[in-house]
Amino acid sequence: MNYKDTLLMPKTDFPMRGGLPKKEPEIQKQWDEQDLYHKILEKNKGHESYILHDGPPYANGNLHMGHALNKILKDFIVRYKSMQGYYSPYVPGWDTHGLPIEQALTKKGVKRKEMPISEFRKLCEEFALEQIDIQKKDFKRLGVNGDFNDPYITLKPEYEAAQIRLFGEMADRGLIYKGKKPVYWSPSSESSLAEAEIEYHDKRSPSIYVAFDVKDGKGVVDEDAKFIIWTTTPWTLPSNVAITVHPDLKYGQYNVNGEKYVVGQDLVEEVAEELGWDKEDIQLEKEFTGKELEYVETQHPFIDRVSLVINGLHVTTDAGTGAVHTAPGHGEDDYIVGQKYNLPVISPLNDKGVFTEEGGQFEGMFYDKANKAVTDLLKENGSLLKLKFITHSYPHDWRTKKPVIFRATPQWFASISKVRQDILDAIEDTNFKVDWGKTRIYNMIRDRGEWVISRQRVWGVPLPVFYTENGDIIMDKEVIYHVANLFEKYGSNVWFDRDAKDLLPEGFTHPGSPNGEFTKEEDIMDVWFDSGSSHRGVLETRPELSFPADLYLEGSDQYRGWFNSSITTAVATRGQSPYKFLLSHGFVMDGEGKKMSKSLGNVIVPDQIVKQKGADIARLWVSSVDYLSDVRISDEILKQTADVYRKIRNTLRFMLGNVNDFNPETDAVPESDLLEVDRYLLNRLREFTESIINHYDNFDYLNIYQEVQNFINVELSNFYLDYGKDILYIEKQDSHKRRSMQTVLYQILVDMTKLLAPILAHTSEEVWSYIPHVKEESVHLADMPEVVKPDEELLEKWNTFMKLRDDVNRALEEARNNKVIGKSLEAKVIIGSNESFDAADFLKDFENLHQLFIVSQVEVEEKVEDGNEYYYGDIKVVHADGEKCERCWNYSTELGSVNGLDHLCPRCQGVVADL
């Protein structure tokens, strides 16, 4: 027999190295074979539900870190809620219509114009479904648990039918209408765009000041005066029909070297500087309010028509001249104010952004090229007062990255103005994690214009509208519901395969079509109407889900996207928000906070992390960032995350190794009989558990990440597990002291594995499979630890002890530096009271102080001679008495021999004698 054979060293087959890239797919295969997703639901059937509704990612392209951040956060929530006993189904979804898929096929060489529309749409559908299969596999590889065998997909007939019915309800309530209005138009996509499809980039544009001669001053302005306007879109001047001034602002007629100009008085200095006027040359001749200027007539600078001076409240003094160039065909404010004055809506561009015949001399020119032609013309006729170039933030198409324009075209609209207040009220009834989230969506709804829902494309859900022979619109609810039923049965391709009369209910007649002829709308719906209908197409149609959802969680760009379109359609049809709680996350940047781009070489993708480090490293990283803002990732950050993972894994492994011979049924010590140090740790565990559960409830994963590290490092590694080695390895196997510690260690191991399960989904499952005597086949089928209020008095007492222990460790470190001792077991510590703390009285109730301090001997005295003064007592460290026990390495003055083993202390003699 040798000394080592007498020790109870940790034993476990749980590997030290994670090997996650290889291990995780095995665990996921096991989950699939167990049908874990449905088992979890079955366990919680009949319980209170918690519904997180998945915002559908677009079915095109590989996953980026934003996808991973989003889906992993959702998985934290659903796994946690499920372990809290909630019935929490998670149905992932995909958004499948729209321009990017059309473009992807065009890039592959598909010629859309050379085939029937329905054939092209079938190719789009095939492409979308292929993309979904790729993304689905990648989401599952991240450990996301959901109903991936039956996701919701916006191109499915049942979804499209639900969307059409929702449209029908909005139409029935007078919320859908057709109008010629200026909308964001993308010449590069040849389609209208919603606000959510716009992003801003810098653009270089001409900045011009133009003079409009007064034609009829109405007795207010001199007939030889000129109004000055400023614009950065010279190409819109052929559509100018008015000049707008603010009714309440003051304007002046200024004489500058014999020329008379009308300018806003607050802006005259800026205009003078721009146009190079000397101050002494400027003379104010007349003053008037904008209201007094109403109906003055000016001459268009190069077209034979009047530009009327009108009033509008949108005019500001932020820039320009206070007199605004007004073209109702090319601006929303212009259009609205133009309606009041019955101004014509001129928009002489085609879908490609090229001037039509209506554009006169500019016919055939691309709008951007027309800028030069217009300025040249103004220069020739003397109307151009100044031309320079500026760089400014300008709207671009989010898909093509090309500039967009405002263009008046016949479009379909969903009325925001009619439901705006109802939506704002619904926002007030919604809960938010952060106040700025509420402010953001509130302001967006408050300030947004009417929603243009039509698109001039083919890959999307058709607008279920018909026209009679005389042009009347047919938008009856019954007709729309009939179309919905056709879509549900045959899919939306039926719209393109059949004639209008075959899509209408049998025997349908209309006074506007005496010959029984009808035509159908050719536009499709905005993709935001698709995804914005998911509360109807998913929450209300799937039996396991319910409306409204408990939570919507997406990137912060969705305040103007999915959050916005969803609450609009839900309030319009159901009178309430589709979500009770709204949560958003930021974007993923590189390690320096820069946007990731291939050109910078700073792109990290989920697939790379999973293959190199494992999904649990990606998941742990998600828990380590403040996701409410933009977050950072880099190889260095992931290396730090992997280091934290290793520490967690090794701590769990150590605990596994030390409970291998423990059966809670037969070996557990009742709480009342536990050693006080073990009771302290049990109560620290309770305190820790309560805090972690609270953080999960509040979606505060960064706090969990930090507190787990703190508990592992401070409570376990630096104290309890270190202290425990002298008990777990050395004491008799069945001794009360050892079983007392194992009871608590087992509890810590089980509870910590559960608490980590939503985040480290694979590792927790692996640990669970090695914990002896657990009942559930998966940690994800277990319940979260119950929150038990800790014993505050006990915690307070031991918190003081831990501070005293810190002082002892400082004294030991000093003794080590002074070569008094080497290892701490070579020490004898003498502690006494001082003025700041009565250590002698405080320590009288503590047992096994030498083990708690990891030294060989401790003496507590009223006063210590020659001790170093610390806050928690005077402490002296000397070399321990006696010699080292060869088994436990503690020093003793009573070494002896048992069973052929020499140099054993009395404790070890007793243990070895019984072997």
UniProtKB/Swiss-Prot annotation:
Q: What cofactor does this chain's UniProt record say it requires?
A: Zn(2+)
As for subcellular location, the record says:
Cytoplasm
Q: Where is this motif: 'KMSKS' region?
A: 595-599
Which InterPro entries has this protein been placed in? aa-tRNA-synth_I_CS, aa-tRNA-synth_Ia, Anticodon_Ile_BEm, Ile-tRNA-ligase, Ile-tRNA-ligase_type1, Ile-tRNA_ligase, M/V/L/I-tRNA-synth_anticd-bd, Rossmann-like_a/b/a_fold
* Alphabetic keyword roster: Aminoacyl-tRNA synthetase, ATP-binding, Cytoplasm, Ligase, Metal-binding, Nucleotide-binding, Protein biosynthesis, Zinc
In the Enzyme Commission scheme, what number(s) does this protein have?
6.1.1.5
Q: Which GO terms describe its molecular function?
A: aminoacyl-tRNA deacylase activity; ATP binding; isoleucine-tRNA ligase activity; tRNA binding; zinc ion binding
Amino acids binding Zn(2+): C885, C888, C905, C908
Catalyses: tRNA(Ile) + L-isoleucine + ATP = L-isoleucyl-tRNA(Ile) + AMP + diphosphate
Coiled-coil intervals in this record?
none
| Binding residue positions for L-isoleucyl-5'-AMP | E554
Motif position, 'HIGH' region:
57-67
| GO BP terms, alphabetized | isoleucyl-tRNA aminoacylation
- One Gene Ontology cellular component annotation? cytosol
**Which positions in this protein are listed as binding ATP?**
K598
The UniProt note on the cofactor reads as follows: Binds 1 zinc ion per subunit.
Domain statement: IleRS has two distinct active sites: one for aminoacylation and one for editing. The misactivated valine is translocated from the active site to the editing site, which sterically excludes the correctly activated isoleucine. The single editing site contains two valyl binding pockets, one specific for each substrate (Val-AMP or Val-tRNA(Ile)).
For this chain, the family text in UniProt reads:
Belongs to the class-I aminoacyl-tRNA synthetase family. IleS type 1 subfamily.
What is the purpose of this protein?
Catalyzes the attachment of isoleucine to tRNA(Ile). As IleRS can inadvertently accommodate and process structurally similar amino acids such as valine, to avoid such errors it has two additional distinct tRNA(Ile)-dependent editing activities. One activity is designated as 'pretransfer' editing and involves the hydrolysis of activated Val-AMP. The other activity is designated 'posttransfer' editing and involves deacylation of mischarged Val-tRNA(Ile).
Assembly, in brief, is: Monomer.
Record's protein name: Isoleucine--tRNA ligase
- Give the species: Staphylococcus carnosus (strain TM300)
Origin organism lineage: Bacteria, Bacillati, Bacillota, Bacilli, Bacillales
